[in-house]
Amino acid sequence: MNTLATPTGLSAASLRHSVSDLKQDRRNEPHVGEKSAAWCLATFTGRLTELSGELSGASLSLVFGLVLEAQKQAEPVAWITSRDSTFFPPDAAERGIDLAALAVVRTGDLLETAKAAEHLLRSAAFGLLVLDLGTDTRMPLPVQARLAGQARHHETALVCLTVKPAKEPSLGSMVSLQAHARKVQQQGRIFRCRIEVLKDKHRGPGWSHMEVGRGPDGLC
């Protein structure tokens, strides 16, 4: 058992205050991968979600956390994109993501991305689908309705990543949860990403989430 020695000349009351201050400091320290209770895979299961950011790094960092959570729960994950460049694999691996278990589907355009997503949703084999759309947000409402319906029916989390300002409207009315991510602080390889929920059909808008991570400079 470890023992705590009282330094000469330090009263018991002073020691109690010192220990209390130390505990408070530890509570205030950022924890890598820290999450709020609402920001978890269960929040997005069965829903069409849009996660946007003016730069893709912040939203990528936050969705990596959901991918990792899904993999820890043995839920298969697929990443679908029509973009020429998407996430940097070493960044994902450093977050703990098993790249060998992550299915990546590349398509020609947004409609092909939506068709691939619908096909994978109908298979009922995936717990999380990420649609990396970039700046292309012209998804027709009937397509959104089909995707949202399949996500709900098969209890799959369907997350669309978009690159745009927070003031721009969501993909459409079928989006159940819309959130905007941004980097608020970075010191070396430790960064903070904040997400503001702009629309939530289940809980209502206005809640936020802060996540602390560690990664290559510029990831967030």
Task: Tell what function each PLM region has.
Residues 58-65, 108-115, 138-146, 153, ...:
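Charged, alpha-helix-enriched surfaces in structured cytosolic catalytic cores
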Residues 74-142:
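Conserved inter-motif catalytic segment of the P-loop NTP-binding fold
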Residues 69, 120, 150:
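Hydrophobic/aromatic ligand-binding patch that stacks against planar heteroaromatic rings
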Residues 74-75, 98-101, 126, 154-157, ...:
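Short glycine-/polar-rich loops that comprise or flank the Walker A/P-loop
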Residues 51, 102, 129, 151, ...:
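Conserved RecA-like P-loop NTPase ATPase core
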Residues 125-166:
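A contiguous pocket-lining binding segment that forms or flanks enzyme active sites
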Residues 158-220:
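Phosphate-binding/switch region of NTP-binding enzymes
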Residues 1-79, 94-97, 200, 220:
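Detector for small/aliphatic-rich hydrophobic stretches
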